[in-house]
């Protein structure tokens, strides 16, 4: 049987029953076919979307034989044309394009919320999703409904199916490309006033970078991540991120190390892009009240400063008068980037910052004796910020009058990230237990397609969890360095201190466990003290460890249990799905 025939049979197996009328590709929004669709449920749509994920073995082959990245952008333009749009159609979306290594999602969230406070209808495309894939496409801050997602998914899927060439090596776009295309169509159909577009990976060759004329661009803090795709130095990564610059389109960035900042400056000059350096948020607060941010953590101030500049620039470009009164200008130093304006944030800007929500980033949930600290940090720099936030939050907590306090780490890391370096940063938090599990909500779960991931095998992720456990054990065996978070001469009980309150180690200190899925890990951590989770029945889901029983007793008797979930946004999403079942409705 031919490869094309096999592929056709496979698509028939996963596609919904029923047929659609074939139509020729026509440009513009009017090109949608009139579909006679059967009752296609949301989960069916997501399962079909998941067939566009690259299987693990094929993904490895692609990495070894990666072609010209510029060709990938040309392919994306072809997909766009097959979907019924041309690149120039995207100009009307008034796009804000944001990239960076850390904080780009939070910066997008701040920016979107600020502009929504002006009464504008906003679109927001982000990745990854935490619980449901429809979170990636938002209108006015809310994920599109299951019904709207399903409708747009099948329209786009059938359009691409009808226009594919079976002789082509790539007949359908991959998962992320498909969702990017879908976001463009949703935003145009919903007639948003603007679209905030978060880059997937990198910038220069990311599929979001097919846009021609964004209104403004932003680059958040840079760091080392996705080295297999972007390069293994800050300079190489900065070059990739600067690829979103467009001639004549204003761009803003935050303070970066000298070398990558120089790369961004040179890249902007080559492209004739006016690039500005954002003053710190403190400069915008001078002479006015301190700004309250809806997202916790000191590192969010940098993201908020960038969001304010980007939002103000967008408002000015679109002729809005109420965009913040300028303060005294600060001259730029010779050879450095020009500084962005220092202005007084308007009441609507302040409101937007205050009401920003972005789940899974410095998020805190209290449920009885358990407090969950959720942050998807996955680079060394973002993990430093996560640890600082976690320790400051613990410092503010009231200590129990009686009973013990237990600290638990729930961790996973994926891809080519250096998990040993991340775990070393977490060690000074004095965890009693370190729990490792894959980003799999439940074992053998087929009822929720949103959480399915075909790009890795179960064997691979479990072996990686065991490697995390070994790294953690070695760190404690080596009795690593004094606390890197303390400052010489700093008073341990001072208000600015990051040192934790005294936390006498238990006899099981630094113990670690590996579970086969998130659900089993949460059952063990909660020990029946959360009505959502039944007490575990050892050794269900547990790769055997001698301290499981003794640890269960400690958790059952503890007055307070503090759980930090970090290392992967997908892990955080799986935990949120189980802690907040309403998010899956």
From Swiss-Prot:
GO molecular function: ATP binding; metal ion binding; tetrahydrofolylpolyglutamate synthase activity
CC cofactor: a monovalent cation
Record's keyword annotation contains Transit peptide: yes
GO BP, sorted A to Z: one-carbon metabolic process; tetrahydrofolylpolyglutamate biosynthetic process
PTM-bearing positions, type Phosphoserine: 537
Keywords: ATP-binding, Cytoplasm, Ligase, Magnesium, Membrane, Metal-binding, Mitochondrion, Mitochondrion inner membrane, Nucleotide-binding, One-carbon metabolism, Phosphoprotein, Transit peptide
Pfam entry (one): Mur_ligase_M
Residues annotated as signal peptide: none
EC number: 6.3.2.17
Transit peptide location: 1-39
Catalytic activity: (6S)-5,6,7,8-tetrahydrofolyl-(gamma-L-Glu)(n) + L-glutamate + ATP = (6S)-5,6,7,8-tetrahydrofolyl-(gamma-L-Glu)(n+1) + ADP + phosphate + H(+)
Binding site residues for ATP: 103-106, 361, 375
Domain of life assignment: Eukaryota
Gene3D superfamilies: Mur ligase, C-terminal domain (3.90.190.20), Mur-like, catalytic domain (3.40.1190.10)
Main location: mitochondrion
Top-level EC class: ligase
Known pathway: Cofactor biosynthesis; tetrahydrofolylpolyglutamate biosynthesis
Subcellular location: Mitochondrion inner membrane; Mitochondrion matrix; Cytoplasm
One GO CC annotation: cytoplasm
Positions contributing to Mg(2+) 1 binding: 127, 198
UniProt record similarity statement: Belongs to the folylpolyglutamate synthase family.
Quaternary organization: Monomer.
PANTHER family: FOLYLPOLYGLUTAMATE SYNTHASE, MITOCHONDRIAL, FOLYLPOLYGLUTAMATE SYNTHASE-RELATED
Role description: Catalyzes conversion of folates to polyglutamate derivatives allowing concentration of folate compounds in the cell and the intracellular retention of these cofactors, which are important substrates for most of the folate-dependent enzymes that are involved in one-carbon transfer reactions involved in purine, pyrimidine and amino acid synthesis.
Protein name as annotated: Folylpolyglutamate synthase, mitochondrial
Organism, as annotated: Bos taurus
């Amino acid at each position: 049987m031919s490869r094309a025939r096999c592929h056709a049979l496979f698509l028939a197996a996963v596609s919904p029953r029923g047929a659609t009328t074939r139509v020729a590709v026509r440009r513009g929004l009017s090109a949608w076919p009139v579909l006679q669709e059967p009752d296609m449920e949301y989960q069916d749509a997501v399962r079909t979307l998941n067939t566009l994920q690259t299987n693990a073995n094929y993904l490895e082959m692609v990495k070894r034989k990666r072609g010209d990245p510029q060709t990938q952008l040309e392919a994306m333009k072809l997909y766009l044309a097959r979907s019924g749009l041309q690149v120039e159609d995207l100009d009307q979306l008034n796009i804000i394009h944001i990239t960076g290594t850390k904080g780009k999602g939070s910066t997008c969230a701040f920016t979107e919320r600020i502009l929504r406070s002006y009464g504008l209808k906003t679109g927001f495309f982000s990745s990854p999703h935490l619980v449901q894939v429809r979170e990636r496409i938002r209108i006015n801050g809310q994920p599109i409904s299951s019904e709207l997602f399903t409708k747009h998914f099948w329209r786009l899927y059938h359009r691409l199916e009808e226009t594919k060439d079976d002789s082509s090596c790539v007949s359908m776009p991959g998962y992320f490309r498909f969702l990017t295309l879908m976001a463009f169509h949703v935003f145009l159909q919903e007639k948003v006033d603007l679209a905030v577009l978060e880059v997937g990976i990198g910038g220069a060759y990311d599929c979001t970078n097919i846009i021609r004329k964004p209104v403004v661009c932003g680059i958040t803090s840079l760091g080392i991540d996705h080295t297999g795709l972007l390069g293994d130095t800050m300079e190489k990564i900065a070059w990739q991120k600067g690829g979103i610059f467009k001639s004549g389109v204003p761009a803003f960035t935050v303070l970066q190390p000298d070398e990558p900042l120089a790369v961004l400056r040179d890249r902007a000059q080559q492209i004739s892009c006016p690039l500005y350096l954002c003053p710190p948020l403190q400069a915008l607060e001078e002479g006015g009240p301190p700004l309250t941010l809806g997202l916790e953590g000191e590192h969010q101030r940098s993201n908020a400063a960038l969001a304010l500049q980007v939002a103000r620039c967008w408002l000015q470009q679109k002729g809005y008068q109420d965009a913040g009164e300028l303060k005294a200008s600060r001259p730029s130093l010779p050879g450095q980037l020009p500084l962005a304006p220092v202005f007084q944030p308007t009441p609507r800007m302040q409101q937007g910052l205050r009401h920003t929500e972005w789940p899974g980033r410095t998020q805190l949930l209290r449920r009885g004796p358990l407090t969950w600290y959720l942050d998807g940090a996955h680079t060394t720099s973002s993990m430093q910020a996560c640890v600082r936030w976690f320790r400051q939050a613990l410092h503010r907590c009231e200590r129990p009058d009686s009973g013990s306090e237990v600290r638990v780490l729930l961790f996973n890391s994926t891809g080519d990230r250096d998990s040993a370096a991340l775990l070393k940063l977490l060690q000074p938090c004095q965890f009693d237990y370190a729990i490792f599990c894959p980003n799999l909500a439940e074992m053998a779960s087929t009822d929720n397609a949103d959480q399915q991931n075909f790009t890795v095998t179960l064997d691979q992720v479990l072996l990686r969890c065991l490697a995390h456990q070994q790294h953690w054990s070695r760190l404690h065996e080596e009795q690593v360095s004094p606390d890197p978070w303390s400052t010489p001469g700093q008073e341990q009980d001072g208000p600015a201190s990051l040192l934790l309150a005294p936390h006498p180690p238990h006899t099981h200190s630094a113990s670690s466990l590996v579970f086969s899925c998130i659900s089993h890990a949460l059952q063990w951590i909660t020990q029946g003290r959360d009505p959502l989770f039944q007490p575990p029945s050892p050794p269900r889901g547990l790769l055997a460890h001698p301290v499981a029983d003794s640890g269960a007793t400690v958790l059952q008797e503890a007055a307070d249990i503090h759980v930090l979930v970090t290392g992967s946004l997908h892990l955080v999403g799986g935990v949120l799905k189980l802690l907040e079942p309403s998010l899956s409705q």
